[in-house]
Amino acid sequence: MSFVHDLQKWKEVEKAFAKYLIDYPDIISIEFPKGKCKDYDVKMTYGNDKTATYEIKTDFKAQDTGNFVIEYRFKWEASWIYASKADYIVQYILGKWWIQKRWELILRIAQVEKRETKWWDWFQSSLYIIKADKLPELFEPLNFNETPNESED
């Protein structure tokens, strides 16, 4: 299963992200395309308001479609999630997973945070889905796994 089939799919991704940039201000920026990068950087700080803020900058390389970069910042209340669990989640997001899994996890974080769902409950329940490689069930809004329509009404 390929992540982004062609440039038309990239256009859909970029258009969809424009909405996320408005709806989810914690997403800092996304750029198309980007230079050849393969690393990520994570910065974690604790605030006086009993929150832990994680900043992730991740450069992904996609076959045949160029590169893109996502910068994402998210914050948890300390009472929601212990630092050890947060660290594990960050490692999971940036671990040795396929590009689409990492991409979808980053987007899903924003969606879950926006809905004020219990983040850790979602993550735990999603581990099985991800390991089972059932990405369409995991990720619904952008429908990456569907072929773009030739025409739109």
In which residue ranges do the predicted regions lie?
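Beta-rich nucleic-acid/ligand-interaction surfaces
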Residues: G35-K43
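Residues that flank catalytic or metal-binding motifs in active/ligand-binding sites
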Residues: K38, K50, K85
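Short glycine/proline-enriched coil/turn segments at helix->beta-strand junctions
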Residues: D23-D26, N48-T51, I93-G95
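Catalytic cores of nucleic-acid endonucleases
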Residues: V4, S29, K57-Q100
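Non-catalytic C-terminal interaction segments of nucleic acid-processing enzymes
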Residues: G66, L94-D153
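Conserved catalytic cores of phosphodiester-cleaving nucleases, focusing on short active-site segments
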Residues: V42-A62
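Acidic-basic catalytic patches of nuclease active cores, encompassing PD-(D/E)XK
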Residues: M1-K36, F60-K61
